[in-house]
Amino acid sequence: MFHQTLDLPEALVTGREDIYLGWFYRTYPARPDAIPEADIAEYLRVYRQPGALRAGFSYYRALPQDIADNAALAARFKLPMPVLGLGGDRSWGRGMEVVESLRRLAVDVQGGVVENCGHFMPEEQPEDLLRRLIAFLG
């Protein structure tokens, strides 16, 4: 995966954050205009800070270890407390895959699919997300 390659993503994206990251912010939501331009500008400002791109790409670099750690944990026990999983129904929102993935790690998985939502749930469906969080945590 490109994001897992050491140093290459930083070298290619630095100075071009608007092209690379802007593409994700306009392509991964259910609607290309779901994230306001002012919000995208702020995300880009933050990712232009020293070390920010490396931190962002390092999330993906850690995935193989996370997968191994989670598999080892799931073989020994499952989380006993309720766990909430939500996935958008469109464009990299992952739908029910989120809930199904969590069922390998927890006994009581709640949640489901958020409609008209892609990858960026808090930005795309904030009211629906808040309603579900309040119901789960309340």
Write out the residue ranges for each language-model feature.
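Flexible "cap/lid" subdomain of the alpha/beta-hydrolase fold that forms the substrate-access gate
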Residues: 1-114, 122, 131-136
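Histidine-centered divalent metal-coordination motifs
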Residues: 119
